[in-house]
Amino acid sequence: MSTLRIATRKSPLALWQAEHVAQQLKQHYPELTVELVPIVTQGDILAHTPLSKIGGKNLFIKELEIAMQQNAADIAVHSMKDVGVTLPEGFVLAAILPRENPFDALVSNHYAHLNELPNGARVGTCSLRRKMQLAHYRPDLKLIDIRGNVHTRLQKLDSGAFDALILACAGLIRLQQNARIRQILPAEISLPAIGQGAIGVECRADSPFLAHIQTLNHFETAVCVQTERVVNQRLQGDCQVPIAVFATLSGKTMTLQSRIGTIDGQRMLAHQEICALEDAEKAGARCAEALIQQGAQDILHEYRK
């Protein structure tokens, strides 16, 4: 009987995602033994420093890939929004699972709507993407960095350190914290991050479990997320850049929305593509080129300094 080892971060959300993948695999392959290999990553160790200042979200990924390289694990489970624009040589994204609610949520103990927040309200978020869009929509808000897992952030809110938080709906739903969601922010206000709400499974290209993992792939989610990633690849963006890209499918038609700007919200570029499904990758490239024509490279250059 084969044993498949899943490398995962130790946070409650990461463990939930790894367990979810394990359950899906067991449904498809009842004879398979699945074990979790929890790993502390640099992103977890540096839990109080904004990601944009310490090298971006790849800090959540690197140690999991090392575990696979050293044969301490067979696959790794990630939040797709944490996965960098390129994978190390010899690794593949074998599956992307069905997307949970991809939008951002307002979480507050006193206010039910973003528009109800008073001038100068303290809003916790560490995401440059969220800061860009919130500052553009409500420049009066005081946007404050917050790190830590979902429960840690909720505790900080409950202690009175913040008037509201902006968190991913998907994480709250998966951790059964749905009741904390006061408002789901529409795309007009806060366009989601690339891959937000989707779980990805990475493995070595020569893994004996590659075919097992590929059975979990959800085509519609995968094509949307991969198209979002094309935009970022063409722009050569990463976690340290305020960028939002979101693709949706309606039948065989894809709508691809994108934004890039400055975290003060004073400059925000946007572009939308509507295309046939088979044209998705080209649409991603066109989207990136349109943003570049508007001046995206100037913004990217500022954040790479």
From Swiss-Prot:
One GO-annotated biological process of the protein: protoporphyrinogen IX biosynthetic process
EC number: 2.5.1.61
Subunit annotation: Monomer.
HAMAP family, per database record: Porphobil_deam
Its biological purpose: Tetrapolymerization of the monopyrrole PBG into the hydroxymethylbilane pre-uroporphyrinogen in several discrete steps.
Lineage of the species this protein comes from: Bacteria, Pseudomonadati, Pseudomonadota, Gammaproteobacteria, Cardiobacteriales
Cofactor (UniProt): dipyrromethane
Protein family: Belongs to the HMBS family.
Entry annotated with the keyword Transferase: yes
Remaining remarks: The porphobilinogen subunits are added to the dipyrromethane group.
Catalysed transformations (reactions): 4 porphobilinogen + H2O = hydroxymethylbilane + 4 NH4(+)
Keywords: Porphyrin biosynthesis, Transferase
Protein name: Porphobilinogen deaminase
GO terms, molecular function: hydroxymethylbilane synthase activity
Gene Ontology cellular-component annotations: cytoplasm
Positions where S-(dipyrrolylmethanemethyl)cysteine occurs in the chain: 239
One Pfam assignment: Porphobil_deamC
Classification via CDD domains: PBP2_EcHMBS_like (cd13646)
Pathway given in the UniProt record: Porphyrin-containing compound metabolism; protoporphyrin-IX biosynthesis; coproporphyrinogen-III from 5-aminolevulinate: step 2/4
Top EC class for this record: transferase
Comment on bound cofactor: Binds 1 dipyrromethane group covalently.
